[in-house]
Every structure is written in structure tokens, then in C-alpha cells.
Amino acid sequence: MMMTEQQPFDLVRRYPGFDLRRYPSHTVAQIKVRASFDKAGNLAFRSLFGYISGQNRTNTSLAMTAPVVQAVTPEPVGRSSSAKDPGSQKVTMTAPVVQRPAGDDGFVVAFVLPASLTVDTAPVPTNPQVEIHTIPAGLAAAVSYSGGWSQSGFDKHSAQLHQAVLDAGLTLIGPPRFARFDPPFKPWFLRHNEVVQDVREPA
């Protein structure tokens, strides 16, 4: 399994300690899991990978896109899908996978879907726990690091990013997200990870 498409963004500026990026509106498949930070991604992966492997109303397989995202907001802001899907398709998975905390109920983990898909055209999941959402365009600070998917690693780089953003005179919005760009079988020391933090548009 390879993540053949990367989530697009425009590099606005490089600051000491982070990149400022502008992300376009994009579509995600997400699921909530009740687990620790370290276990949430692996628990969610099976259901989300099942969705892109054909567990949807059209039996469509999707290519995997990077990243997978795990982050800190109860719900994404944007539209969700209730559309009906007429037939079978093949879907690519995009990188990253995103993970964020979901209040006291664990974490939300999301696969970023290929840029060609919207909430109206993405296959409808057969698993009721998997939801399709549109995430609106926005400005974000991001820092990359290699290594495992531990909470300690995320917390360390999140704290560094937080301080760097404040030092740059920018305002943080909401909690940070954890973005994973590699499949679980890749050696931990070769994995590409990011912490992504929404920021307010400069005046």
C-alpha cells in the first residue's frame, strides 16, 4: 500500500521553526475512536482503509493519499455527505492521514481524499462510523519531523511549533493536528510526520 497523492498546499512563507501554508478546501473520510493518542491511529486505520478499499455503496477502491490526520477539534467545520452513490469506483488515498482529539471521547482520525472528490462525489461509506466531510480552505503553520507516532513526539514538536508561531507574531486558532504521511509498515525512523496548526490571517 502506497500513498500516491499528496495533499496540495501553497507555501506562503518560511519562518524560523515552521512553514506557513495555505491549504485549499478538501474532502476527508473520518472516524471517531475511543483510544489513547498512540493507539487511535492504528484502531481507526482498519475502518478507513476498508472504506477506500471498497467498503462503500459502490464497492469503489480508492488510491491512498497522504497524509493521515489526527487532531484536536470535536468536529470539522464544513459540509458532510448524505449523498447516494450510484455505482462502483476506484478511489486513491491521499497523504497525510490526520488525527485530532475529539473532546473526552478519544480522537478523530481522517484520510484526506483525492482532490478530485467532493462530499457529493465521494463513495458513500457502508460503515456508519465513517463520515465524509468538507474541510474549508485555511492558513496553517506546519513543522515536519521524522520518527514514530508517539504522543511524546507529537507533544514535543507541537510545543516548539506553538512557541515559534507566537514568536512570529501570528495568532493560533484551535488545537494542532497530527499528520502522518507513511503506512504503518514503514520503519519508524523513516516516517515523515507533521504537526499542523491553524493560524489567523495576518492583518
Task: List where the protein language model places each region.
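A solvent-exposed interaction/effector surface
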Residues: 1-203
